[in-house]
UniProtKB/Swiss-Prot annotation:
The keyword Calcium does not apply. Residues 43-282 form the ABC transporter domain. The complex is composed of two ATP-binding proteins (MetN), two transmembrane proteins (MetI) and a solute-binding protein (MetQ). It is found in: Cell inner membrane. One of its GO terms (molecular function) is ATP binding. Signal peptide: none annotated. This is Methionine import ATP-binding protein MetN 2. It is a peripheral membrane protein. The keyword Zinc-finger does not apply.
Length: 398
């Protein structure tokens, strides 16, 4: 529990300080730590590495990580279990020191801070956990008010602040309820309110929705997006779920075996993933062909012509790079008009239309008898499709 309170910035781990002396010291500590130049990144990692000692020797958890999180954005960090996501977050709030490189939060070098400086940092850096870590013997109000009480904030100010936060997270009616009577989503809302009590500049979320059902997850993500808009708060969100990234993040970084292998705007990474780890994480969102349809798709014959009445199956993808709406009508016209849509759809991510269409198109009458060897009519069909999409490939024929 001491580590939890330390993470939240509830306590000072240096010599005991109480009353007015503590308040004066905290104010001085805050005033001597610059917030960084205007326009600087809220969180910056420069060639950061982290090595842990194990019984088998040195183990690298992070390797040469360089990231910039812009002020006011929601930045998602995604990776599989053991990729190094949580280690990265612990470096940002000073629970771990980097083995190499530099971590800055609001322009302050986290690795250079002493214990007093770390306490001040954690009060400016809110933390939302996967597990709610609420005190069962205290009410919702008391759980949220606790860090303010420990920090010596006067009672009247505590009441004002906590009531405003409970209103913000939609729990005003649960003010006097105990954690045992709350749903998982309500408990996480308490955790979010508690993380905001010190008016943080950055909010760190460590798998904040992974213990929740899908409907509750969406409500918590909507709350985080609302807080980001209302308060202009920078949010760094750790997750292993691409659905979470798509729903709320502006920018995403993909971590694989301790290295950042891909980063960029969410729409770009989703529409045109460039690393195998990213494609693997996105596979849960990319729907494969239904089994009955996949069974019907036959490979193109290498030498012979297609059977009479056969149609070429094309996998057409839109990445959103053009910024406009996919002109599906123009695609159909370019393919000769005899087109069937077999599978897929278009969605919008950050205002960019992207998606996948699996279509069946007939060869032109004059080309229908040509051999498929060395391209020929099928290659011409594919080329026409590529003029109206970002990517297109032949899957076979039906």
């Amino acid at each position: 529990m001491t580590q939890l309170f330390d993470t939240l910035g509830f306590i000072d781990t240096s010599a005991a300080r109480t009353g007015a002396a503590a308040a004066t010291h905290d104010a001085a500590a805050t005033s001597t730590e610059p917030a960084g130049p205007a326009g600087a990144a809220a969180v910056s990692l420069e060639q950061v590495g982290k090595v842990f000692a194990t019984p088998r020797g040195q183990a690298a958890a992070l390797r040469d990580v360089t990231l910039d999180v812009r002020r006011g954005e929601v930045f998602g960090i995604i990776g599989r279990s053991g990729a190094g996501k949580s280690t990265l977050l612990r470096l940002v709030n000073g629970l771990e020191r980097p083995s190499s490189g530099r971590v800055r939060v609001q322009g302050v070098d986290v690795g250079a801070l002493d214990e007093d400086g770390l306490v001040a940092l954690r009060r400016r850096t809110g933390m939302v956990f996967q597990h709610f870590n609420l005190l069962s013997a205290k009410t919702v109000f008391e759980n949220v008010a606790l860090p303010l009480k420990i920090a010596g904030v006067p009672k009247a100010e505590r009441v004002r602040k906590v009531e405003a936060l409970l209103e913000l997270v939609g729990l005003a009616a649960k003010r006097d309820a105990y954690p045992a009577s709350l749903s998982g989503g309500q408990k996480q809302r308490v955790g979010i309110a508690r993380a905001l009590v010190h008016d943080p500049e950055v909010l760190l979320c460590d798998e904040a929705t992974s213990a929740l059902d899908p409907e509750t997850t969406q409500s918590i993500l909507a709350l985080l997006a609302d807080i980001n808009r209302r308060l202009g708060l920078t949010i760094v969100l750790i997750t292993h779920e691409m659905e979470v990234i798509r729903a709320v993040c502006d920018t995403v970084a993909v971590i694989e075996q301790g290295e950042v292998v891909e980063t960029g705007p969410v729409w770009r990474v989703f529409g045109d993933p460039r690393h195998g780890a990213t494609r693997a994480l996105l596979s849960t969102l990319v729907h494969d062909l239904p089994a009955e349809l996949a069974a019907r798709v036959q490979p193109l014959p290498e030498q012979a012509a297609l059977p009479d009445g056969a149609q070429v199956v094309l996998d057409v993808r839109y990445t959103g790079e053009s910024g406009g709406e996919p002109d599906v009508g123009a695609l159909a016209a370019a393919l000769g008009g005899s087109v069937r849509f077999l599978h897929g759809g278009i969605e919008r991510i950050q205002g960019h239309a992207q998606g996948r269409l699996v279509i069946a198109a007939a060869l032109r009458a004059e080309d229908a008898g040509q051999s498929t060897a060395r391209g020929g009519a099928v290659a011409a069909l594919l080329e026409r499709a590529r003029r109206h999409a970002n990517h297109a490939e032949v899957l076979g024929y039906v």
